[in-house]
Swiss-Prot record:
It holds the Pfam family HATPase_c. This is Heme sensor protein HssS. It comes from the Bacteria. Its EC number is 2.7.13.3.
């Protein structure tokens, strides 16, 4: 029954309307019983007494005609004589339920307040209860005989047009309300159905169909969030495809080269050529090994929930160790490396930070002009740790700088790197809640700046 949100909302709303109508009826019934019933009884009793006074003062001899006239004026009247013979005028009562004790009470000269004393019933409105006990009664004198006269207004006749009007109004109200509820429910459910279809497309890998924001309420916000999610998923999917293509290319190229070298090695070559081929194969295998290590490290960084950042990192020792390890490359290009390294302590992952700093220093050595200078600085300034590496090589155009940290990015085809070093470095710095940036110009060279919060 409630398999769809559309049905659920429609049934809930209709139930609320019907429940509200029932509660309103009960409230009105209670209000009539405790507030209006006595007033209604007194008003009808006053009318009946005025009728008796007029009957007495006018010396009406034809009682039948007089009460028939009152009945024609939309009153229901019952007259009981001393022998308990009952005569009715006006519209007939639905039931004759008055007790003999009530009749005797009136014949003895006491007034009867049946409307005021009508017992309370939850689902029956006493005002419309067309029974003889729901009347007021007083004695009349007719030819020296007492008559018990009971009267109530003919509600059905008096309010017949109003009841018709009220019934039409209620039917129209319920009909229009239910129609509008169904229509408004559909307008609410329609964008949700569209979102459902969109999620099914996303589930099947279709990230190209946009989700339009058709509203400005909570559902519109949901549409906006779904569209943002779709764009993010599309970006991730594009990156995944691009990543797979790049990995395939990076693996295929050295494998093709190795295959060609092995084919050459099988032919008749002299010892010098054989040694050269073996050396090239060794370089390609080393390249593949480094690529595999970097891919594994990237995978580890992308799923970093298991990583610990609780090492007490001694940056001065860490950077000094990297410089000592890279001394051969520095000497080979006859570079001058100047360092100004303060004693800075930091809580993080020592292995990853060593990798990030090593990548920056290795790049500075690799892309420096021979006989140039490299400047390495580390200091703490007002709670922020700064690590900068500057080299004097070819400047990096501003249009290229935003792409330096993309995975597999290479400035030119001759670059024999994997294009993953700076991407790895950026991921490591971000995991430590830091930032990395680059500036490059002819005067100052190229500077990579890493900033880390002292309290990580």
């Amino acid at each position: 029954m409630f398999k769809t949100l559309y049905t659920r909302i429609a049934i809930y709303t209709i139930t609320v309307i019907l429940f509200s109508a029932l509660v309103s009826f009960l409230f009105a019934n209670v209000y009539y019983h405790f507030n209006l019933k006595a007033h209604n009884d007194a008003k009808i009793m006053r009318t009946l007494k005025e009728a008796r006074a007029f009957h007495t003062s006018s010396n009406q001899s034809d009682t039948q005609s007089y009460f028939k006239h009152l009945g024609d004026m939309n009153y229901q009247i019952m007259i009981v004589d001393h022998s308990y013979h009952k005569t009715f005028f006006g519209e007939p009562f639905r039931k004759d339920t008055i007790s003999d004790s009530a009749i005797n009470q009136v014949l003895k000269g006491k007034a009867y307040h049946g409307i005021k004393n009508k017992p309370f019933e939850l689902f029956i409105t006493g005002f419309f209860d067309n029974e003889t006990d729901n009347t007021v009664g007083i004695p009349f004198n007719q030819n020296n005989q007492k008559l018990a006269v009971f009267m109530r207004p003919d509600i059905g006749e008096t309010f017949s047009e109003f009841r018709t009007f009220l019934a039409v109004l209620l039917i129209c109200l319920l009909g229009i309300s239910i129609t509008l509820v169904i229509a408004s429910t559909y307008s609410i459910i329609k964008p949700i159905k569209i979102l459902k279809q969109a999620t099914e497309r996303l589930m099947h890998g279709d990230f190209n169909s946009p989700i339009y924001q058709s509203r400005h309420d909570e559902i519109g916000t949901l549409q906006y969030r779904f569209e943002a999610m779709r764009q993010s998923l599309k970006q991730v999917d594009d990156m995944r495809q691009h990543f797979v293509q790049n990995v395939s290319h990076e693996i295929k190229t050295p494998l093709t080269h190795i295959h060609r070298l092995l084919s050459t090695l099988q032919s008749n070559v002299n010892q010098g050529e054989r040694d050269q081929i073996i050396h090239e194969i060794h370089e390609e295998v080393t390249h593949l090994s480094n690529l595999t290590k970097e891919l594994l490290l990237l995978s580890e960084l992308d799923n970093a929930t298991h990583l610990k950042f609780e090492d007490d990192v001694h940056f001065k020792e860490l950077i000094t160790d990297i410089i000592r390890h890279e001394q051969y490359g520095i000497d080979n290009k006859q570079l001058m490396l100047m360092s100004d390294i303060d004693t800075v302590h930091f809580r993080g992952n020592n292995r990853l930070l060593h990798q990030a700093c090593s990548n920056l220093i290795q790049n500075a050595i690799k892309y420096s002009n021979p006989n140039s200078m490299i400047d390495v600085n580390l200091f703490n300034n007002e709670g922020t740790i700064y690590f900068t590496v500057t080299n004097e090589g070819h400047t990096i155009p501003e249009s290229v700088q935003p792409h330096l940290f993309d995975r597999f990015y290479k400035r030119n085809a001759e670059d024999n790197s994997n294009g993953l070093g700076l991407a790895i470095t950026q991921s490591i710095i971000h995991l430590h809640r830091g930032q990395i940036s680059v500036t490059s110009n002819d005067r100052d060279g190229t500077t990579f700046t890493v900033t880390l919060p002292e309290t990580n």
